[in-house]
Amino acid sequence: MTVRGAALAPDPASPTTTTASPSVSATPEGSPTAMEHPVFLMTTAAQAISGFFVWTALLITCHQIYMHLRCYSRPNEQRHIVRILFIVPIYAFDSWLSLLFFTNDQYYVYFGTVRDCYEAFVIYNFLSLCYEYLGGESAIMSEIRGKAIESSCMYGTCCLWGKTYSIGFLRFCKQATLQFCVVKPLMAVSTVILQAFGKYRDGDFDVTSGYLYVTIIYNISVSLALYALFLFYFATRELLSPYSPVLKFFMVKSVIFLSFWQGMLLAILEKCGAIPKINSARVSVGEGTVAAGYQDFIICVEMFFAALALRHAFTYKVYADKRLDAQGRCAPMKSISSSLKETMNPHDIVQDAIHNFSPAYQQYTQQSTLEPGPTWRGGTHSLSRSHSLSGARDNEKTLLLSSDDEF
């Protein structure tokens, strides 16, 4: 009783009692002491560190894109390469903006939507680039058609024992990647709509939350796309060997799928209580948003190393050496703006999707034809296999392939 009385009517001569009492009552529940670890995401240090890696990655990649557009000597190949390279600026800058505004549950979802849509675009372009390297569908089929599919548990072909490669196999690979280009944007739009109605929260696996169903659909779609890429690489790895496909394949796969599995790991950690929420008088952020903030910070750092690796994997120097044609003449070069415009034109993707998903699919492809009379210099052939395939695309005619079994 005396203690409570002293607290209500403090003695002016004892200031310690007066100062101690308000300090206890003024400390809100969920004070900064409860968020010592995650508060790093809100500091200037986190923004500066992530910003340094992001802007450095942007400079490296934008210079590489500029050089590809300047040496735009193989449009059919470089169109897909430039599209793939754009994943670094989009991923890096988008993640950095999400990190800057991660305390708002709305903003980071919208930023992530743009990033998610583009990653599906990259998978398709990587497969299309491999097609271009090998001269198109008909050139690939002339090499692998009728060959038995080797059974391998590593590449997931153990269930295909006894089957042979057919045009249906290539169609399946294209369809499996194209479906991801459709499913991913649809899931991104669904996420925005569910978020607006309060039915979506990162890391919430409750049956009433849209996060559970979006994650399941996305998992199925991305697994199918990845499986198709593995199958195609398994079938053509020897043909692709002159183009260093392992590094290219690893980089594209890691940039896209590593970020996904990082997000899944953070969601599991959040569910286990390893990621606390931020709850203070100034701001209140749920565990799912904090996990998304960590994901954005990690991506910002990773994009710097991705930019360095992609610079080596998709070097422009190969195309700078191809400015001279077989006759030693300077190949006509387009302006950088027109090359960029051609690169960003999605007409080829739309046409490919219509062709591969059309019920009237006739199993036709573009057959490349080589000009006769190869040039010999000093007793050695002057054109490599890659030059021959590239030059072959200059003269194309439509060839109707005979129908065979679907894959």
Curated annotation (Swiss-Prot):
InterPro entries: Ostalpha/TMEM184C
SMART domains: Solute_trans_a
GO cellular component: membrane
Superkingdom classification of source: Eukaryota
Main location: membrane
Entry annotated with the keyword Membrane: yes
Pfam name, any one: Solute_trans_a
Biased segments, Low complexity type: 1-28
Residues with Phosphoserine modification: S388, S402, S403
Keyword Cell inner membrane: no
Keywords on record: Membrane, Phosphoprotein, Transmembrane, Transmembrane helix
Compartment(s) where it occurs, according to its Swiss-Prot or TrEMBL record: Membrane
Location of region: Disordered: 1-31, 369-395
Protein's membrane topology: Multi-pass membrane protein
Transmembrane residue ranges: 40-60, 84-104, 121-141, 178-198, 214-234, 249-269, 290-310
Homology family: Belongs to the TMEM184 family.
Functional note: May activate the MAP kinase signaling pathway.
The name this protein goes by in its record: Transmembrane protein 184B
Native organism: Mus musculus
